[in-house]
Amino acid sequence: STFPQPFSAARKTMNLIAKLLPTSNVQVDQDASSKKRVFEQAGIMFENNQGIGRSTVFDSLFAREKLGSTGLGQGVAIPHGRIKGLKEAVGAFLRLAAPVQFDAPDGKPVNLLFVLLVPEQATEQHLQILSELAQMFSDRAFRDQLTAAADAAAIHALFTSWEPHAASERRAAV
């Protein structure tokens, strides 16, 4: 690599999400009338950008959702699924034009979704990714910034610049 080692090492520990969310996988103000439509749109995006079949994505997300809602509350959901043959985790972020019902624990409809696809064999890293996403989305300031961001590039920048420690320090200071 052309960067001195400390820079790339710091970059790696910064956040897992930055590595698995390409800018092309950020969609803003999507129209979706239901949870199913959201999964269909995610499928189309992963098919167009990563070559993962849309029906494979849809079926995987839907199967996981049947086990229990991936809605976290506060208008956020993290639908996720396992994909046979996938080599490494990949994510997508959708901000919906209007929120959809998601059977979230607080009953609130969802308009911020991070869709995560992981290889069939679960690893510790996948749990770390989900944990980091939950931490990100529990940060009210971060949710507000995602909602207010002008476009996909601005949202992508929020995800890549987010730091776990900064969020917990902000919460502690409240």
Which ranges hold each PLM region?
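Cytosolic covalent-transfer regions centered on His/Cys nucleophiles
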Residues: 3-174
